[in-house]
C-alpha cells in the first residue's frame, strides 16, 4: 500500500484528550482495559471510520498506552486515513474472526485481565461474545457500555462546529421543501430537491428522514414515494443531515396551498409552547421540566388524545 496521509476529523490533541478521559475511567474502575464495539465509540475514541462499520470491528483501549484496532482487512486504508494508529490487527473473509480477535486481545492485555466490554453494542452478537469469553479463560468481564457514551454527551467546540454546519444544511433542506410544496409536485420531487440542497449546503448525508403527505402525514416514520401533492395536503418532513456523522435535524409540517385563520392560530400556539419549553433548557435542569411543558400543553390543546413520544433525546 502506498503511503497514506491521515486526514483526521479532529486534532491529535483532541483524540488524546478523549483517550485520557477513557483511561481515567478505566483506572477509576480498577480495570485493565475497555473494549469498545459501538461504531460511535470506536470512531469517537480513535478516529477510525469506515462506511463498512457494520462488520466485526472493535478497539482495545488499555488502562495506559496505545489503543489497538481490530477490523476487516479491506478497511486498512481507512485506519491509515482516519487515525494515527500503527497498532492494529486485520482479518479477512476466510478467517476465523473470533480466533483472531481473541489473539489480538491477548497480545495487548496478556493471559489474564479484568476487562469491560460494550455488551449492549448491536455489532457484538451474543454468540461472538460467548466465544470470545470461552477463548480467554483467564479474563474477568463486566459491562462497560456507558463509559464512552457518557463521555460523548458533552460536546467539544470542534464537535459543535460540525453540528452547526449540519444544522445549516437542515435549514436549507427545509426551505427548499417549502418551495416545492405546491399541487402537482410529488414526494419524490421534493425529496430530490431536499437531498440536493442539503448536500450543496455541506451535509455528508443525502436523504431526508420522514417525508410523507396526505393520510400518511399523520403517522410517524413514513418515507417518500410517488404520491402527487394536492391542495390542502399536509406534508410531514424531517431533514436529517450530518457532517462527519455529527447530526442536526428537525421536523416540520408543511401545508400545500393557503392556510386558514384556524391553521395560523394553531401554529402560533405550537410556536408559543415550543418557545416556553426551550426557555427552560439550560445546564442543570432536568429534561422532564421542558418535556412536561410540551406534553401537557399539547394535550390541553385537544389536537391529540395521547402524547407518548419522547422529547430531548440526544442525536449528536
For each feature predicted by the language model, list its residue ranges.
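Active-site neighborhoods and metal-handling regions in enzymes and metal-associated proteins
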Residues: 1-316
